[in-house]
Curated annotation (Swiss-Prot):
Protein name: UPF0173 metal-dependent hydrolase Smar_0891
Keywords: Hydrolase
Family: Belongs to the UPF0173 family.
Positions of disulphide bridges: none
GO molecular function per UniProt: hydrolase activity
A Pfam family matched in the record: Lactamase_B_2
NCBIfam families linked: PRK00685.1
SUPFAM superfamilies in the record: Metallo-hydrolase/oxidoreductase
Species the sequence originates in: Staphylothermus marinus (strain ATCC 43588 / DSM 3639 / JCM 9404 / F1)
Keyword Hydrolase: yes
Annotated InterPro entries: Metallo-B-lactamas, RibonucZ/Hydroxyglut_hydro, UPF0173, UPF0173_UPF0282_UlaG_hydrolase
Transmembrane segments: none
Length: 228
């Protein structure tokens, strides 16, 4: 089982059962100070966070990862250069690169390609899984055909996909991404935070559900989705 809480923009808090059978809480791209965020940075005082995954170092994705890691003792997981930066800032980190499974004993995790930009290392997506659920967070990316390999190799149950356009895929491209990845559930992200990335998630839902068996779950910031 996984409980996915949307924190606005591309930020998520996810609770799942780890490979060791214990409950794990992870954050992905925790820009907690985003304009749509339902939580405050102070809400993470005395919280148990196991891992913080950062897809790239743009401010709306690296976000508040360092502050939260210092407060909670969470390990930051990301491309080598981001993990090195985290260590320089005094927090624990796990460095990896795009390729195979990361050496994390209690979770399945893989850094995937993303078509974007980043100042520290390559931009990535991430596939993260526990005992019974696998989730793909695409990070910031354009559409690319190798998304079909992410679906083939890792079979994510849930795909978290940007739909806002301008900096990432728009609705049309994100629909094609769903067709390539073939997740059971797709959750849109990275839209309506700023004017340039204004998009209609209902249009995304209509197009996906009329062309694929995938179900689209639209989350407002602060809402949660439990799978299965």
């Amino acid at each position: 089982m996984a409980i996915i809480k949307y924190l606005g923009h591309s930020a998520f808090e996810i609770v799942l059962t780890g490979l060791d059978g214990a409950e794990k809480t992870i954050l992905i791209d925790p820009w907690i100070e985003n304009p749509l965020s339902p939580v405050k940075l102070s809400d993470y005082k005395n919280r148990k966070i196991d891992y913080i995954f950062v897809t790239h170092d743009h401010g709306d994705h690296l976000g508040n990862a360092i502050e939260i890691a210092k407060e909670t003792g969470a390990k930051i997981v990301g491309i080598f250069e981001i993990a090195l930066y985290a260590r320089e800032k005094g927090v624990q980190s796990i460095d990896g690169n795009i390729g195979g499974k990361l050496n994390i004993p209690d979770l399945f995790a893989v850094l995937t390609p993303a078509w974007h930009s980043s100042n520290r290392g390559a931009p990535t997506g991430v596939v993260v899984g526990g005992k019974d659920v696998t989730i793909y967070h695409a990070g910031d990316t354009g559409l690319f055909m190798e998304m079909s390999l992410i679906g083939e190799l890792y079979g994510p149950d849930i795909a978290l996909l940007p739909i806002g356009g301008h900096y990432t895929m728009g609705v049309k491209e994100a629909v094609k991404a769903v067709q390539l990845i073939r997740p059971k559930i797709a959750i849109p992200m990275h839209y309506n935070t700023f004017t340039p990335i204004k998009a209609d998630p209902e249009e995304f839902k209509k197009l996906v559900e009329s062309t694929t068996p995938t179900k689209v779950v639209i989350l407002k910031p602060g809402e949660t989705f439990t799978y299965p």
